[in-house]
Amino acid sequence: MSEGTNYTPSQQAVIAQQGNNLLVSASAGSGKTTVLIERIMRKILAGTNIDQLLVVTFTNLAAKHMKQKLESQINKRISQLMTDNPAQTTASPAIRQLRQQLNLLGVANISTLDAFCLRVIQRYYYVIDLDPVFRLLTDNTEGLLIRDQVWDSVREQLYDEDGTLFDLLTANFSNDRSDDGLSRLIFRLFDFAQSTPDPEGWLSKLPEPYQVDEEALTASAFYQQQLLPLLINEVDGMQMKLRQAQKVATDADLVPKTLEVLATAQKTLTTLREQLATASWNELRTQVATFKIGALKKTYKDEPEKTARAKTMGTFVDGVKKQMTTLSETYFAADEQQVLDIMVGAKSIVTELVDATKQFKTAFAAEKRRRHVLDFSDLEHLTLQILTSDNESSQAALAQLRAQFEEVMVDEYQDINSLQESILQLLARDQPGNMFMVGDVKQSIYQFRLADPLLFLHKYHDFGTNPEHGERIVLAENFRSVANVDHLTNLIFSQLMDAPVGQIDYDEAAYLKYGPKDYPADMPQTTNLLLYQTETDKSTEDVSTDETNFSIDDPAVGSITMVAQKILALKAQDKPIYERANGEYRPFRYSDVALLVPTRNHNLTIIDVFKRYHIPVVVNDAQNYFQTTEIRIMMALLSIIDNPYQDIPLVAVLRSPIVGLDENQLVYLRIQNKTSDYFQAVQDFYHHYPTGPATEYGDQVYAKIETFLTQLTEFRDLARRNQIVTLIWQIYERTGFLDYVGGMPAGKQRQANLHALYERAYTYEQGSFKGLFQFVRFIRRMQEKDQDLAAAVAETDAEAVNVMTIHGSKGLEYPVIFVMDMDKQFNQTDTRSSALLDREAGIGITYLDPETRVKYPTLPQVVTKQVVSKKMRAEEMRKLYVAMTRAQQQLYLVGTIKDIDTATEKWRQAFASDGRVLSAQARIAATNQLDWVGMAVMRHPAMKAYWGDEWPNYELTDDPTKLAVELGDATTVLAEQSEAVTDTQPDALELVEQQVTIDVDQVTRDYLTTLLNFHYPHQASTTTTAYQSVSEVKRIFEDPDTPLMNANPTVSQRRSRPTSRFVTGSLELPQFLQTTQAPTSAEVGSATHLVLEQLDLTKPVNETTVQSTIDGLVANRVLTTNVAKLIAVDTIVAFYQSALGSQILDNPAKVHREVPFSLLIPARQIFDVDEHETGKVLIHGIIDGYLETADGLTLFDYKTDHVKRPEDLKTRYAGQVKLYAAALASMYPGKVTKQYLYSLPQQVFVPVN
């Protein structure tokens, strides 16, 4: 919604409301941020200072943007006041008040709740006797390390103190290999507890459901309060199915016997329901086990319609039977005594688990206090403690904060938890209420962060029925999307989302209302289902893929290819995107598109397919950081530095570019020793090969292994004596690996990843954690927990398709949205664990009988699983809502099916529902979002082609949604692929051979002849460069008579001849590919020049001072020891004992060393170009030195070459020195009087005329 838009009545109400609490339910695209900013502006204009408002945002970025928008609005208001009344000055009260708000904006309480809590603690730390000197753990890594360290200590203590009981606890949640299962559970339980206002109290209540004492099971509080409602719901569901079966049978006039059977079954269910609250467990178990439905007539001869209706009726009846079987196997699998025995044993386990968690909680807090650190959870708990402590200081602090804030404003209210709610409620006033809460519970998708959308829902219902508690206003207008996106969203969610299954009623108030006034009425409005079929009766044998070398062997590839082809089709359209800013249609841009994925599993496939279609793409977190090649290699190397006797990481390093062995060479090593571990085989080869028969192949392997083992020994020594960060950086430097990955595809990203590993090691050691073994172990734990290192920022192409998770898309919008992988199965991991957690239901565990070693599900686990499953489905619905409402103009729902007939047959179960909302059974039975969407659209008239002989009980005849279904399979997708390649990449030879006949007049013919016969007058210059270094062109001066090019090259020679640039004949191998460490003469020469440059000329130059200079360069790691020891110290001393050297030492202020220069000279002096060529070449270089004397400038150039005669230096380098002299002459005309080459090995000067 643009800022200039007139506010709707509901928006005006939100902006103007005051005098009570206000809950704003803001649907997607309803302009809630704009409304929130305007509400703040109204309060400022009414006299409230901005620091009198507490504005809580969900992220730091949101807070930053809000401040920026407020600053912009305040400045606009100031400009408006001065424009409306030019006589008004900046000293006027209104403008002065607004300028004051700009000054206060920097200290305004517009931030996340964590940031606000930090300010409260820093202000009122004395209330709870907190040491004010603390550090915030902004990096989660250090917190995890401390947590692991503390738990290791607590666990050892529990093993010693609790003995058998703790052993039973460990066995219940771990396995024979490790007790990591218990560790993970302790941490999960701790995190859950920390999200509540009273962690200790919440933990203490966890064993209560297992408390049955001596009373009957069905009389226990657990049964009556938690299990009974679930059983009633199950029976109610079966009765509803039977009523639907009875209605079908009655309407179709089926045989009376059928109606009798159904009535009997219904009566049995009614009796069961009545007895659920009062009968004993064993009585209920018997009734459930013996429930039966009599035989029903399924076919009616010569009456196909009755047969069809009987089939529909049978579907309902089969559903009842299946549900009753599940009830028997899930709830009533054991008799009462068995259940009680299991509950008693499980209670002791849960009690011990709670005690262990409390001990860990206490020890963790103590360790953080000892280290003077706090984490984000501490901020909220300490703030709550400050506000609720039973002392005068606490009461005074609370009173001050309440008095300070005229209003408490909470953005994204649906994503807070009960702890945060407690803090906000304390800060708010009671009479009148001053809380402003805005959000959309339909977009609450952060359950994994322990957000609690039920808090929003409770207030929504409470304010609706008790207006004295607060007001509620719904912002239903969607100003983001075209009408059809709203229609499809309403069509789907009005059938899917209700309180029993989705936690929320998607009623008329929740419907998206079309808000924009600027979209053209004739704008295309179709939304699409893109369905890739994996099994059809078509064959791919007739499709030639030779041109593409491409096949589809993965359903994900098929659906992604369909999307790529759709994007290309959009690209080919003439201006398909409407630009609302200027009211015109414009061409399609790749950045108009976002692909929303449920997980990152197929991101690499997206990159691969899109690359094939030349579609630029930006993928956030294309793969897990730990799975990138460079990080896996580094982690493998660190692992074997810690312990080389690990086959997998060892082979990974040997195969990597650091060593460079190929598969055959790895096999060759293993053949040398087939029985021992691989490192022993490597060592055996290294020690035995030199004494055996040598081969060229073996020599190659030996050279690499020798280098590797040398480096490994050095690295292991470094690891013992240095920090991890030093080790990692030395690995980068000595192997050249950091430079190597920079040359790989996405090199900058890979280098950033390696730098991130270095930074992570630095953070690790800053937290007082030491040791390579512990660091490697920590990284492995991070991988096991699916915790990633800080993502390194990669460069992105702004003009590219965006790929992101649905969570990552929240708050964003794009003209074209593809919701991907809708057939992905819901994640059931949380329901399969041996311990299920829920804030309300508590904990449900699987119990391991210590005698029989058999695991039994407990009834609290059954209850908790139902609660967790319901919340999971509700969150999946909300994720789908978020994904669909990101679309502005075009929306595509993408999924994979077996074939359309099979899919629509499954989706037609929606026909049995009598009302708009689909039956709970059908929605709960769905295993992915595509089935939800399929059932919801199935009753729409657009899908009539797939109805077959069936007809929905409730038809959506008046729904305005425009829907299209596009089907694809391997045949059609490959065919379109072939056409796309043929269209966009025609064969070059084919184009050349095309015969084109045209008529041209003589004038055109003469003009074309002139063009074809044109000769560029500076053709020779196109084969030269405009930039050269002295070292590159020095050969031209060795023999000026030697032509660089043939005088009259042939056409073929012109085509094949490279550009004239004089360079060295080869490039140095990277360090990790070198097999020797011996310094080259060039390296020694460069080092000698460096020493000559660094010598202090104000002191005597002798062997001691020269060696001291060399030692200093080695100490500073400018020179290596291997190079330094080869520098001829005596030759340097000899230079300064010469006449010129003595003159230099006598006038150190007059000598200039290592002087860089640039010089423009005519190209014809260097290259074989036309003498009339006027182009010039830029020469750059560095002059070794020159001395200012009374007679002029004396130029000298050191040489370390070993030559037979000094004159050879003159032959080789005279031209180079002449260039130096020309450069000096251009700076000091007429002053260069002497030019010398000095041979350091022969200790003689060679004059250059």
UniProtKB/Swiss-Prot annotation:
Record GO biological process: double-strand break repair via homologous recombination
Enzyme Commission designation: 3.1.-.-, 5.6.2.4
What cofactor is this protein dependent on?
A: Mg(2+)
This enzyme catalyses:
Couples ATP hydrolysis with the unwinding of duplex DNA by translocating in the 3'-5' direction; ATP + H2O = ADP + phosphate + H(+)
Pfam families xref list: PDDEXK_1 (PF12705), UvrD-helicase (PF00580), UvrD_C (PF13361)
Q: Which residues form the UvrD-like helicase ATP-binding domain?
A: 5-482
The disulfide bridges present are none
Cellular component per GO, a single term: cytosol
- Alphabetized GO MF terms: 3'-5' DNA helicase activity; 3'-5' exonuclease activity; ATP binding; ATP hydrolysis activity; double-stranded DNA binding
The yes or no answer to whether the keyword Lipid metabolism is present is: no
Write the record's keywords in alphabetical order, separated by commas: ATP-binding, DNA damage, DNA repair, DNA-binding, Exonuclease, Helicase, Hydrolase, Isomerase, Nuclease, Nucleotide-binding
Q: Which InterPro entries match?
A: AddA, DNA_helicase_UvrD-like_C, DNA_helicase_UvrD/REP, P-loop_NTPase, PDDEXK-like_dom_sf, PDDEXK_AddAB-type, Restrct_endonuc-II-like, UvrD-like_ATP-bd
Tell me where on the tree of life, at the top rank, the source sits: Bacteria
Report if keyword DNA damage is assigned: yes
Where is the UvrD-like helicase C-terminal domain positioned along the sequence?
A: 521-811
Name the positions where ATP binds.
Answer: 26-33
Family matches, as CDD domains: DEXQc_UvrD (cd17932)
User: What is the stated purpose of this protein?
Assistant: The heterodimer acts as both an ATP-dependent DNA helicase and an ATP-dependent, dual-direction single-stranded exonuclease. Recognizes the chi site generating a DNA molecule suitable for the initiation of homologous recombination. The AddA nuclease domain is required for chi fragment generation; this subunit has the helicase and 3' -> 5' nuclease activities.
Q: Which family is this protein grouped under?
A: Belongs to the helicase family. AddA subfamily.
Subunit info here reads: Heterodimer of AddA and AddB/RexB.
Protein name according to UniProt: ATP-dependent helicase/nuclease subunit A
Source taxonomy: Bacteria, Bacillati, Bacillota, Bacilli, Lactobacillales
